Amino acid sequence: MHSFFGRLAILAAAFSFMLVAAGPASATPVASSATASKKQAKLKVKVLPASQASLLKSGVKVRVSGRPGSRVKLSFRSSSFDEGSRTLAKPRKIRLGKKARVVKVPATAGARAAASTCAARSLNALAVSGKQRARGSRALTRNLADCRLAPIDITQAQVCEFIAQPDQGNCMMPFPSDFYTRKDRNSPTGKRISFPVAAMPKNRNNVSIDPKNWNASDGFSQGQGILVKVPGIDTAEDVAANDFAPLQTLSRYAERNQRAVVINTKTGERQPIWVEIDANATDPDKAALMISPATNFDQKGRYIVALRNLVDADGNSLEAPNAFRYYRDAIPTSTGVINQRRGHFEGIFKTLRKAKIKRSELYLAWDFTVASNENNYRRALHMRDEAFKTIGDTSMGDNVVQGAAPDFNVTSVEDNVDSKIARRVRGFFTVPCFMTKDCASTGEFKLDARDLPERSDNDYQANFECIIPPVGLEGANPPKLRPFIYGHGLFGLALENSFSPVTRDLTADYESISCATDEIGMAGIDRFTVAVPALQDMNKFNQLVDRLQQGLLNGLFLSRLMHHPDGLGTDPAFQDGDGVTPGESVIDTDEVYYVGASQGGIMGGPMTALSPDFTQSALIVGGMNYSTLLTRSSNWSTFAVIFNPSYPDELSRPLVLNLTQMLWDRGEPNGYAHVTTDNPPPNTPAHNVTLQLALGDHQVSNFAADVMARTMGMKTNAGGIDDRRWPDYEDLWNIPRIGASEYPYRGSSMVYWDGGPYRLNPDNLSQDIGTGVPPYANVAPDGQWEDPHGAPRGASGPISMMNTFLQPNGFIADACNGEPCRADDWDGDFDSIIPVP
C-alpha cells in the first residue's frame, strides 16, 4: 500500500515539471477556444417535430444555425416509399444572426395532399451557405383520424393469418400464405408447411382437420387456388367493377393497372391468372374471392399476391384491413405479434415496387411458396422403384425391360363375346403393397423416418380384364396386337374395358389388345368406403390419396405384364388357338401404350409421368386439378349433398377443397404436370401425351384441361375452336398452334372435338342435341344440354388420331385440314341450325 502511494507522488511531481517546461500555460486555452468557435460556426439545420395536422395548418418549421451574418438558402422536400422525393415547400433565403433561427414555411398544395395520406413520410430540409451544406430530416407524425387505427383482434394471431382480419373472413385466409410455413434447410424449398390444428377448418361435428399430412409438404400446390375474403367484393357484379382478369380473357392479367396481380419473385414476371367470386356461395358475405393460375406455378417458386385499388359494384373505394395497414402504412404499435413481421412485409413491398406496384395503393399483399416436384412424386416414385426392384429392374430410365415379369393368374376366358371382342380374359396379378390393411380400401400409408411408404408384409392381388379383337385370333397367321392399358371412368371398374367405345374401336379396327385394372383410390369399391367418409371428415382424405398412389403402381405393373416377353403372352388365354391349348402369343411386346378416358384421362397423367414402359399416352376428356374440376363438374352434385352439410360454412368449403389439392397432388396430374413430358422424375424416360377433349364437356372442365396443356407445353391444331361457338372467349390462349409444316406432329398435343351447339336434331325434331360452351362461373354446365363427354371416345376422328399417336415415334396428323375439329354428328353448318324452342 505505501509503495503504491509513493509511486503516485513521484508521477505527480514529474507531471508538474513537464507543465512548467512546456512554456506559458495560456497557449493551449487559446487553441481550444478557436476550435470551439469554428465548430459553433458550422452550418446546421434541424426539422422540428411536425404532425399531419400542424403541417396542413402551418407548414413545416426548421431551426437553422451557423456563422452570424451568413446567407443561407433553404430547400424543402418530402419523401415516401412510393414517391421518392417531392417538393415540400418553396425555397427560402435567410440571413443568420447570433442565435439559431426558426423558419416556418407553408407546404405546397401537392405536399399537403400527400401528407393527408397515412403513408409513412419523411420531411427533409437542405441548407446551403457558400461551400457549406447541411441536411435535416424528421418523420412526419401521422395524427389524422384515419391514421389512428382501431385495435385489432390479435387473440388468434399465433394461429391465424390475421392481415385480412379473420373476424371479417376466415382464420386461414388469405390462403395460401407463408405465414403457415417454417424454415427447413433439409427440404428442396427450404421450407415446410406448418398448419396449426387450431387454424384448420372444422366439420359439422366440430372436428378439426388434423394437419399432419399437410405438414409433410415443402410448399403449397403448384396449381394452388388463391382465396381471400374481401368485404365489399361479394358478388359477380363487384368482381366486374374491378376489371379483374376474367377467365374468358386471360391476357388481361398483364394489364398495367390490373387490380389483382401475382408476381414471381425470382423472375419479377406476373403469373397468368383469372379472378372470380365463388358462385356456389348462397350468402354473399360468405363468398370467397378466388384467384386461379392459368398455368401452374413454378416448382419451388415464391409468389406475391397483390390486390390494389379495390372498389365495390358502385365504385366506392374499399379501405384496406387495419391489420394490413400496420404494415402498408408503417403505423407504429407496441404489439409484438405485429412488429415481428414488419421486416418480412418490407421485403414484399420492395419486390412489388420493382414491379411498379405502389405500396400506398395496396388493399392486401402477401406471399407463399410452391411445393417442389420431388414433394409431389417422391412417395409414388419410391414405391415404383422398390416394387420394380422385386422383379429385378432397377434401371428404368433406359426404357428397356429387365428382370422378370410380375406374377399373374388367369381366372376366366370367354370367347366370342360380341362382334368386336373375340376373347375376354380376366384374372389377377401380384403387386407389392405399400398400405396398411394389405391394401384394403380403408388402408393408408405407414411412413418411415424418411416420410416414405413402407412395404407391407403381404402383396396385393390386383384384378385385370383384357379384350382381344377377332383380328388377333382369326386365320393361320394373325397379326401381333399392339398392347395398351386402359384407364376407366369416375369410380368405375376394369370391366368398362369391354364397353368403352375407344377400347372396342381401337382394338377391333386397329389391331390392338386392351387391358384394364381397377384404378383403386377412385374405383367403384372406393366410392362408399373411401370417398364418402372423406367428404364427411377430411381427416380421412389421405386414405383416398394414398390409395391412388398404390393404384398408379398397379397400373405400372399391368403395363409391364403386357410389355414383358414373359408376361401375359405366356398364357394360352393370350395365344392364338382356343385359349386353352398353348399357341403363339397374340401380343406385340415391343412397345406398350396408355389410353385413358374421363377419370382415366386424368389419372393417366401421373401414371405416364412415372412409367418406365409406355412413353406415348392418349388422355381422352382429361384434365387436372380436382379443386378446380369438382364444382365445375356435373358429377359434383352427387357428392356435394354429402360434403356441403358436413362442412356447412360456405366460406370454408373452397378452402377445404384447396387444402385437399395439396394432398391430391401426390396422386393426380396437377402435381406431376411439370414432369409428365420432359424433365421426368429420376430414372424415368421422357413421354409424349395427346389430350383429346370434348368442347363444352359437362364432367371434366375445359378450363382445367387448358391449364394442363399450358403447363405441359402442349400444342394444338391450327383450327382450334370455332369463333362462332365461343365469340367472347379468348380460346386456347397461350397454347401454340401446330404449323402446317410441323405435321406430322410428334410432340405433346391437345385437340378439341366439337359436337355442335345446342339445337334440334334435324333427323328427329323431338330430340335436343349439342351443347353450349361451359359457364365461366365455377359451376357445372346447364344440365338441359347434351353432355359431349363421351363424344371423343366413339368418334372416328379422335380414334384415328390416337391410332397414329400410339406408335413408336407416334404422331398426330392434320386430320381436320386446318379447320376446327368436329365430332361425327356436327358439320359446322351454323346456317342450318334449328334452334330449340
Task: Identify what each model region corresponds to.
Residues H2-N170, P174, R182-T189:
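Polybasic, low-complexity, intrinsically disordered segments
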Residues K93-V102, A279-D285, E454-N458:
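Short proline/glycine- and polar residue-rich coil/turn motifs
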Residues R148-E414, D418-A440:
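Acidic, low-complexity Ser/Thr/Gly/Pro-rich repeat segments typical of extracellular/periplasmic
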Residues V239-P246, P272-V275, R302-A306, A313-F324, ...:
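Short, solvent-exposed loop/turn and secondary-structure capping segments
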Residues T282-R308, D312-A313, D457-F499:
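A conserved hydrophobic secondary-structure block that centers on an alpha-helix together
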Residues K437-A462, G475-G577:
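Cap/lid segment of the alpha/beta-hydrolase catalytic domain
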Residues Q543, R547-Q550, T615-P837:
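C-terminal subdomain of alpha/beta-hydrolase-fold enzymes, centered on the catalytic histidine
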Residues Q575-T631:
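Primarily recognizes the serine-hydrolase "nucleophile elbow" in alpha/beta-hydrolase
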